[in-house]
Each structure stands twice: as structure tokens, then as C-alpha cells.
From Swiss-Prot:
Cytoplasm in keyword set: yes
Compartment list: Cytoplasm; Nucleus
Classification lineage: Eukaryota, Viridiplantae, Streptophyta, Embryophyta, Tracheophyta
Gene3D superfamilies the record matches: Winged helix-like DNA-binding domain superfamily/Winged helix DNA-binding domain
Main location: cytoplasm
Keywords assigned: Acetylation, Cytoplasm, Developmental protein, Nucleus, Phytochrome signaling pathway, Signalosome
UniProt GO BP: negative regulation of photomorphogenesis; positive regulation of G2/M transition of mitotic cell cycle; protein deneddylation; red, far-red light phototransduction
Purpose: Component of the COP9 signalosome complex (CSN), a complex involved in various cellular and developmental processes such as photomorphogenesis and auxin and jasmonate responses. The CSN complex is an essential regulator of the ubiquitin (Ubl) conjugation pathway by mediating the deneddylation of the cullin subunits of SCF-type E3 ligase complexes, leading to decrease the Ubl ligase activity of SCF. It is involved in repression of photomorphogenesis in darkness by regulating the activity of COP1-containing Ubl ligase complexes.
Position of the signal peptide: none
Protein name (database record): COP9 signalosome complex subunit 4
PANTHER family: 26S PROTEASOME NON-ATPASE REGULATORY SUBUNIT 12/COP9 SIGNALOSOME COMPLEX SUBUNIT 4 (PTHR10855), COP9 SIGNALOSOME COMPLEX SUBUNIT 4 (PTHR10855:SF2)
Modified residues (N-acetylmethionine): M1
Alphabetical list of Pfam families matching this protein: PCI, PSMD12-CSN4_N
Length: 397
């Protein structure tokens, strides 16, 4: 092989030189011999071969990588990327093709993080070549989706944050939808459940069934709706959660979901018993059942807070030992959780530590005041529209 490479480098005509090298490359790829492939790469990157020829040959090599056995592909691709690194500015296009090929191979083997890491090595801010914003956005989203397959929300978020600067100007509806799904999943995995629920619910309301080349499957929309319900149930109990629960409960589509029975009980502020909680637990993903510093789980915390809020609707006051029995937890833990919820305005009440009693306050007055404010706003809006109509101005409907 060394002789063949030497003979090829001695050819004066550039076109003939490239054709001869391509014949050698074809032979190397057919042999699936790693050492021969490495020698070929070393040679075409050496000073014996002009840069313009090296680029063409490396491009051909990158495009034909799939002819090699998977393990050989990985070895030679990594070797090539290492060899061109000192001169990567001269071989950006070729490095891009190699990284995409290798990432595709890792993805086919479900090595999600390795695929993401390979793609993250692509220089999206190159000053040597024009990089389209659409391409940048697609790569950032692709990398984020790969990390999410490995439940790596930290690295996924880093690339979704990069995508956020590009998506506002994007006209590509498929990429925009993929961005929304990734963002919702990241919020979910970071346990920002209420924000995630709102994102999932927005996705579930998509009316189009064809976006670009992508068909919107009914099952995917149902999964998004189910995820919205799950995240809302897991969110910290309080007024915001109650409003989202009301929206979901009134959505007729939710009645067809497997988790509808628990949605109904949570919305109606019923106390949930262990068998119901265990049944709900079976539908959760690992991060939604993760352990917290106090050795409880995300699910435990959500269910205790829900049951505590439900108890506040049933009792005017209750002793902490009785509350602990009701919630099936230590009375001191019940007191701490209640204090946190009251302090965060997620539950109305006060604690008498001397008597070891929690007093619950009725929030009916606050709701009536809220209704009056909404009614006043609607009346003011009607007055404005009536005034516009009297003046002959067009009134938007």
C-alpha cells in the first residue's frame, strides 16, 4: 500500500492523482482494515498531498464511512477527527460529515449521549463558512433530544437555551414544535411540574395534523395531555395548581385518559389513599419518583401536600398528632409541611405551637373578591365596546 500511495503522490495531473487515490480508498474500505485506513488518512493529511486534494479525498472518505464495519467505523472516525484537529479550520465540512455519520451510528445503537457528544463537536459559530440559522437550530434541538433520551436534562437544557435565541425567528414549524416538546420535557425533569404541565397542555391542543413533512399523531397529543395531567398532580398544592386542575378537568379529552380517576379525585380535593397513590405511581417516570434529601420521594411530597390541602377543606382546625395519622406521616413532619405551605401562600391558615394545633382559614371571601374583580373588568370592557359602537367605530369580535 505504501508503494501505491507513493506512486499516486508522484502523479502530476491533479485529476488523475485524485482518481488514483480514490481507487486506493475503495480498496481500503473494501478490506475493512483499520491499520490500512489509518495509513491512508495519515498520508492524505501529510505535506505530500496538496490541501485541495486532501479535502476532496477526505470528503469522499467521510461519505463512504458506512462501508466499514461499525467498530472499524468508530475507530477510524475518531482517529481521523484527532488527526485533523490541529488543522480543523481547513477541514470543517469534512469533520461535519464524519461527526454526523458517527452520531448516526451511535444513535442506531441507542448510545444517545455519545451521539449527542459527537454532534456537539460541530462548530456552529464558524467564521470560515456560512452556517444557516435553521441548521444551527436543528442541530441544537437534535442534540437536546438525544440527551433527553438518556434523561440528561442538564446537558439538554444547555442546547435548548442555545436554540431559544434562534427559535423566535424560525419559520420552520417542525423545529418549533420539537423545541416546545424538548422544553416541556426539560421542565418536567427539573421538577418544575406546573410550568411543564402548561407546556404539555399547549402541545396537546395543536389542531394541525400535518406540520411540514411531519404527521401529528393523535397518540402523541394524548401523551402530551396525559403528561400535563401527571405534572399538575405532582406540582406543589396551591391556588395555581388548582386553576390548572380546573382547566384539565373541564377538558372533555381528559375523561378518556387512564389517569382520569385520580385527576377527578385531586380536582375534587378528595383525600387520596395509599392504593390510589400506588396505582398512580405505576404510570410515572423514574425522575417523577426520585428521592428527595429528606428521604421521601417527589410523589410522596406531592400527595402529602394534596392531602393536607384537602384536609383544610374538611376541618376548621386539627391537632398535629391527628393530622399526622390522617396523612400517615410523623406529626412533626406534618407541622413542617403545613408551615411551608402557609408561608408560601399555598394554604390559608395559622399554627398554634403551644396547643399543637393548625387552624385553617376559609378562602371563600377571597374567591368572591376575585369574581367581583373579573366581573368589574368585563363590565368596563363592555362599556368601552358600547362607546365605540355609538361612535360608529368597528368593534372587533
Amino acid at each position: 500500500m505504501d508503494e501505491a500511495l507513493t506512486n499516486a503522490s508522484a502523479i502530476g495531473d491533479q485529476r488523475q492523482k485524485i482518481e488514483q487515490y480514490k481507487l486506493i480508498l475503495s480498496s481500503v474500505l473494501s478490506s475493512n482494515d483499520l491499520l490500512q485506513a489509518q495509513r491512508f488518512i495519515d498520508h492524505i493529511l501529510s505535506d505530500d498531498v496538496p490541501l485541495v486534494v486532501s479535502r476532496q479525498l477526505l470528503q469522499s472518505f467521510a461519505q463512504e464511512l458506512g462501508r466499514l464495519e461499525p467498530e472499524t467505523q468508530k475507530e477510524i472516525a475518531q482517529f481521523t477527527l484527532t488527526q485533523i484537529q490541529p488543522r480543523v479550520v481547513s477541514f470543517e465540512e469534512q469533520a461535519l460529515v464524519i461527526r454526523e455519520k458517527l452520531a448516526g451510528l451511535y444513535e442506531s445503537e441507542q448510545e444517545w449521549s455519545k451521539a449527542a457528544q459527537m454532534l456537539s463537536g460541530i462548530d456552529l459559530d464558524s467564521g470560515m463558512r456560512a452556517v444557516d440559522d435553521n441548521f444551527k437550530l436543528s442541530k441544537c434541538i437534535q442534540i437536546a433530544r438525544l440527551y433527553l433520551e438518556d434523561d440528561d436534562a442538564v446537558n439538554a437544557e444547555a442546547f435548548i437555551n442555545k436554540a431559544s435565541f434562534l427559535v423566535s425567528n424560525s419559520q420552520n414549524e417542525v423545529l418549533n414544535l420539537q423545541y416546545k416538546v424538548c422544553y416541556a420535557r426539560i421542565l418536567d425533569m427539573k421538577r418544575k411540574f406546573l410550568e411543564a404541565a402548561l407546556r404539555y397542555y399547549g402541545i396537546s391542543q395543536i389542531e394541525q395534523r400535518q406540520i411540514g413533512d411531519e404527521e401529528i399523531d393523535e397518540n402523541a397529543l394524548e401523551q402530551a395531555l396525559s403528561a400535563a395531567v401527571t405534572c399538575t398532580i405532582l406540582a406543589g398544592a396551591g391556588p395555581q395548581r388548582s386553576r390548572v386542575l380546573a382547566t384539565l378537568y373541564k377538558d372533555e379529552r381528559c375523561s378518556k385518559l387512564k389517569i382520569y380517576p385520580i385527576l377527578q379525585k385531586v380536582y375534587l380535593e378528595r383525600i387520596l389513599r395509599r392504593p390510589e397513590i400506588d396505582a398512580f405511581s405505576e404510570e410515572l417516570r423514574p425522575h417523577q419518583k426520585a428521592s428527595l434529601p429528606d428521604k421521601s420521594t417527589v410523589l410522596d411530597r406531592a400527595m402529602i401536600e394534596h392531602n393536607l390541602l384537602s384536609a383544610s377543606k374538611l376541618y376548621t382546625n386539627i391537632r398535629f398528632d391527628e393530622l399526622g395519622t390522617l396523612l400517615a406521616i410523623d406529626p412533626r413532619k406534618a407541622e413542617k409541611i403545613a408551615a411551608n405551605m402557609i408561608g408560601q401562600d399555598r394554604m390559608r391558615g395559622s399554627i398554634d405551637q403551644e396547643e399543637a394545633v393548625i387552624h385553617f382559614e376559609d378562602d371563600v371571601e377571597e374567591l368572591q373578591q376575585w369574581d367581583q374583580q373579573i366581573s368589574g373588568l368585563c363590565q368596563a370592557l363592555n362599556d368601552i365596546l358600547d362607546g365605540m359602537a355609538k361612535k360608529g367605530m368597528s368593534v372587533p369580535v
